[in-house]
Amino acid sequence: MKLVIAEKPSVAMSLAAVLGATERKDGYLEGSGYLVSWCVGHLLELAQPEAYKEQYAKWRYEDLPILPENWKYEVPKDKKTQLALLCRLMKDKRVDSVVCATDAGREGELIFRLVYEYAGCKKPMERLWISSMEDAAIREGFDHLHPGSDYDKLYDAAVCRAGADWLIGINATRLFSVLYGVTLNVGRVMSPTLALLVQRESDIESFISKPFYVPEITCGGFTASGEKMTERSEAEKIRMDCDHNSAFVRSVEKQVKTIQPPRLYDLTTLQRECNRIYGYTAQQTLDYVQSLYEKKLATYPRTDSQYLTKDMQATAASLILWLRDNMPFGKGYAGEPDIDRVTDDSKVTDHHAIIPTVEIARTDLSELPSGERDVLTLLAVRLLCATTQVHRFEAVTAILDCQGYTFTAKGKTILQSGWKEVERIHRMSIRQSETEHKENEAVALPVLQEGQTFEAVSASLREGKISPPKHYTEDTLLSAMETAGAEDMPEDAERKGLGTPATRAATLEKLVSAGFVQRKKKQLIPTEKGKNLIAVLPDNIKSPILTAEWESMLKQVEHGELSATSFMDQIADMSRTLVKEHTTPEERFADLFPSSRGTAHEAVGVCPRCGAPVYEGKKGFFCDNRECSFALWKDNRFFSSKKKSITKSVAAALLKEGRISMSGLYSEKTGKTYDAEVILDDTGGKYVNFKLEFPVKKGRRK
């Protein structure tokens, strides 16, 4: 009997249905020689520093860098039951082999392997590697299972990725948080991405907008423009010289140009397009296309390829013909499908481009949630665009002379709409399409000939301002992340850029949730906290070049070209250097980090739970670590019952000594006052507890 382990319940249900495992059990399905169960995402996570040494529970410079020799893992409380079940199933005597059916990628491999190793399982392991959840694809995958050992290097790369994120995240976060007295979350991919946003914001803020002036002449139903100028008087002189005078055509140049169809979508280009057209965040798009994949309507989403493989050509051709004949935008499709244009086995590694599956023909799209419907429609539109005719037009450039000044008029005439007709029909059906269409609309010039003369032209002055750089949107930031550091890497480097298609969306969400970035409509704007963090970080942490190199090295680990040990040694060395080179806060950054919760710059004390600074707020004293719940409330029930409150001096004493001597404590029972030591008795729960300790009374002399 085979035990099949999927990444999530919905996928397990689909696999079980195809395999005939229809008998429901508690946490798994059984039947036809299979047990089918699931993980719920990561069942095991890298343990926090205090799991290695108790002293690491507090954030202290002298403990850095923290470099575990062997990784420890912990189980989230809400996942212990499922992990225990999988361990039991792996040890079941009926099970003679285990099939890894988690997502076919680096993270999916890590999710399964950690469970397999945690259970101490030694049974043969096989790998299901598919790019579609269609029944036929599942059957094909189970008919051709791969030896699990084929993916050992993929697992090594996954462990390295997680380990590198832990080492940089833990050490850099603690280092700069301790130095500057406020929690500063640093991440291997997150920080360079934030740096891109901060640099763009700096470029915008420092930009000095200057006006420009363009003299123009209108004649024969078209407008020709002169040279852009910065001096109004100069441009105005040209306008006055030309107005109501004659102009003649000095030259006419015609050139037939071709725009090739776009490539198919990989995850990043799909996320960019969805943000630009619909305003969806990268995470929303990933969620929608993941759901479509699980519903068997789209192929595997976490891909960086924009091509198909040769064995898909027949299926793709029949799908294209169905889309052409049944979808509204199919009316714009011309000619026979050119599948060869989107086929290249050498450019497909783990997974091919994202396309719809044939299940779309059996699905009522109106019943899908709007986000999923939008994404699936885009996938269908792109498949048609990528395989139909090229877009061809004639570009015309006319040079006119008026009073010795040169003016240029440009226009174009569509010769073959090609793929742009499919796109045009689709865009006309969605919101904000009219404006976009008009902006891209071709403007044809009248027939012009050299020497042609126009009498009494109308001259005018067009004014404008040089625009500053635009704020990043998720569309443009994803593009920047994809190419970051590419110019500093060799041409043959397999992976360039920040993060992977599968992780970029999560990186953006972390930046927002950590308070480093805020969304304003489609724009991503760094906050003051984000700007200040980038100000104090060293160049190698915030530079995309080093992180892009690491991504390329992880690919080398995956292919067996670099050992996991070599990779991790480099990360550890960087962690050591980081701590060694930053021993004290820089004076120029001293005032950048007032408490996000408090009113004073100075910390009241140190959190007894995590070692982060504690600041005074309006209603209490709070740990600055967002993940820590420690708080001393000013209007505390324990103190208020004794007609006292936690003042700043009381809080400081409790945090420093763990106790404070207080006089005049009120007794609700006797109505009298007394003196006692108040002791901070924190057990790590939601609320902080206190207890009293009374001074020992001296005995009477006999």
Which ranges hold each PLM region?
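Metal- or metallocofactor-binding catalytic centers and their adjacent structured scaffolds
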Residues: 232-265, 271
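Conserved short loop/turn motifs at secondary-structure junctions
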Residues: 1-3, 101-104, 181-183, 254-263, ...
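Short, polar/flexible loop-turn hinges at active-site or ligand-entry regions and domain interfaces
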Residues: 71-74, 102, 122-126, 147-154, ...
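C-terminal or mid-to-C-terminal helical accessory/interaction module adjacent to the motor/catalytic core
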Residues: 93, 135-219, 254-258
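Helical mechanochemical/support elements of P-loop NTPase systems and associated helical scaffolds
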Residues: 7, 11, 78-86, 104-115, ...
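Intrinsically disordered, low-complexity regulatory segments
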Residues: 1-162, 166, 430, 457, ...
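Basic, low-complexity terminal or inter-domain segments flanking catalytic cores
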Residues: 2-3, 90, 173, 282-283, ...
